[in-house]
């Protein structure tokens, strides 16, 4: 049978399965592809295909992730599934596989377990916007009251971590039943119901081009007779020639005007998300701008020095530190295009952080950086990556 060409005429959304080990994340991923394959919305991908996920590198960290794609009538999805718990932690913190939403898989037979809690907390910390719950293995639970109890527990846990526990859709079913065609109600129908919930409940992410303009500064040149040109890749939004923009980070914020946009040596009237451009700035001196700052829409991003972060610290085997670190640890934090020194403050009751740990910590940078929640960074010592993190909240 000829492969159908994937039409890109549907809105795209990135999701993933999260939850405790052996609660059925990978089986569910396989079941979704099986059920949607009936209507031509996917190619069935078996459990063992997904489970031997290839390794990939993100921010110097090796992570195993499996990617499958499928579509419903409303949307096209890229779905990520990780084989091990450590891969989830790394994935969510580095943003290697950006998630616009996630399906939390909980085994009805076991109820919420330690990693269920940890994945919900991580989803909150790294800013996953919405969750939908699949209560798996319902064919192993005969007592409907027990099912209700597990559902209540899950809702309480979600609320505890600031997700709307009362409103989140919880779909009861069995991934195995769907894969083995044993129970249509808990299998096939539950999967369709789950996808309906995902379609309806996980908000469509705003496309990068529709967001306010931002471009990290990579290089600065002075062109005689024309002025200063700043180069970089536009991260989001659009910059039009003649628009006022701000230079944010490292020093005091300055206003300037973009008087020209150049790409591949051609002049354009605008640059947009994904473009590698040179931006000509009016009245800005070569020494007024440096790598590590950003150009952005005025007022859209502010410089900050203090923030709370969720970080993963590499193990020795991953090329990280061999020893733990303590409060007042001073590494470099690599934001976008540059390193900035910062001081780490560990939470009350945390004596030290071991290689391989993930940790919530407070960081004070020695110079301000254009910063927002969900911004990713690497932790480095003399150019060597020893960790990865994400801004969970800004203090000042």
UniProtKB/Swiss-Prot annotation:
This is Elongation factor Tu 1. InterPro entries: EF-Tu_GTP-bd, EF-Tu_GTPase, EFTu-like_2, EFTU_2, G_TR_CS, P-loop_NTPase, Small_GTP-bd, T_Tr_GTP-bd_dom. It is found in: Cytoplasm. NCBIfam families: EF-Tu (TIGR00485), PRK00049.1 (NF000766), PRK12735.1 (NF009372), PRK12736.1 (NF009373), small_GTP (TIGR00231). Residues 60-64 are annotated as: G2. GTP binds at residues 19-26, 81-85, 136-139. Mg(2+) binds at residue 26. The gene is tuf1. Belongs to the TRAFAC class translation factor GTPase superfamily. Classic translation factor GTPase family. EF-Tu/EF-1A subfamily. Monomer. GTP hydrolase that promotes the GTP-dependent binding of aminoacyl-tRNA to the A-site of ribosomes during protein biosynthesis. SUPFAM superfamilies: EF-Tu/eEF-1alpha/eIF2-gamma C-terminal domain, P-loop containing nucleoside triphosphate hydrolases, Translation proteins. Residues 174-176 are annotated as: G5. It catalyses: GTP + H2O = GDP + phosphate + H(+). Residues 81-84 are annotated as: G3. Residues 19-26 are annotated as: G1. Keywords: Cytoplasm, Elongation factor, GTP-binding, Hydrolase, Magnesium, Metal-binding, Nucleotide-binding, Protein biosynthesis. Residues 10-206 form the tr-type G domain. It comes from Rhodopseudomonas palustris (strain BisB5). Gene3D superfamilies: P-loop containing nucleotide triphosphate hydrolases (3.40.50.300), Translation factors (2.40.30.10). Its main location: cytoplasm. Its EC number is 3.6.5.3. One of its GO terms (molecular function) is guanosine tetraphosphate binding. Residues 136-139 are annotated as: G4.
């Amino acid at each position: 049978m000829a492969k159908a060409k994937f039409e890109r005429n549907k809105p795209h959304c990135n999701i993933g399965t999260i939850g405790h080990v052996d609660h059925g994340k990978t089986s569910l991923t396989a079941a979704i592809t099986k059920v949607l394959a009936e209507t031509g919305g996917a190619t069935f991908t078996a459990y063992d295909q997904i489970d031997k996920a290839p390794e990939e590198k993100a921010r110097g960290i090796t992570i195993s992730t499996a990617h499958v794609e499928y579509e419903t009538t409303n949307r096209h999805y890229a779905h990520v599934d990780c084989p091990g718990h450590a891969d989830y932690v790394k994935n969510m913190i580095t943003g290697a596989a950006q998630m616009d939403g996630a399906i939390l898989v909980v085994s009805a037979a076991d109820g919420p377990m330690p990693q269920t809690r940890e994945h919900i907390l991580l989803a909150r910390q790294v800013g996953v916007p919405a969750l939908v719950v699949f209560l798996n293995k319902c064919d192993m639970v005969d007592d409907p009251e027990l099912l209700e109890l597990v559902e209540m527990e899950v809702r309480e846990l979600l609320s505890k971590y600031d997700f709307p526990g009362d409103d989140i859709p919880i779909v009861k079913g069995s991934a195995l039943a769907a894969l083995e065609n044993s129970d249509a109600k808990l299998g096939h129908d539950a999967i369709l119901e789950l996808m309906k919930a995902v379609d309806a409940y996980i908000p469509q992410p705003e496309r990068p081009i529709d967001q306010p303009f931002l471009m990290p500064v990579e290089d600065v040149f002075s062109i005689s007779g024309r002025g200063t040109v700043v180069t970089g890749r536009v991260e989001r939004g659009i910059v039009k020639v003649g628009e006022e923009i701000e230079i944010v980070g490292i020093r005091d914020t300055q206003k300037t005007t973009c008087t020209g946009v150049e790409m591949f040596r051609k002049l354009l009237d605008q640059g947009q998300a994904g473009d590698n451009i040179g931006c000509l700035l009016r009245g800005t001196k070569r020494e007024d701008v440096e790598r590590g700052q950003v150009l952005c829409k005025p007022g859209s991003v502010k410089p900050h020095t203090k923030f709370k972060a969720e970080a993963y610290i590499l193990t020795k085997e991953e090329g990280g530190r061999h020893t733990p670190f303590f409060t007042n640890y001073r590494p470099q934090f690599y934001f976008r295009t540059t390193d900035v020194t910062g001081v780490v403050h560990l939470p009350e009751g945390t004596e030290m952080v071991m290689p391989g740990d993930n940790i919530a910590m407070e960081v004070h940078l020695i110079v301000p950086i254009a910063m927002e929640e969900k911004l990713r960074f690497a932790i480095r010592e003399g150019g060597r990556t020893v960790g990865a993190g994400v801004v969970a909240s800004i203090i000042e």
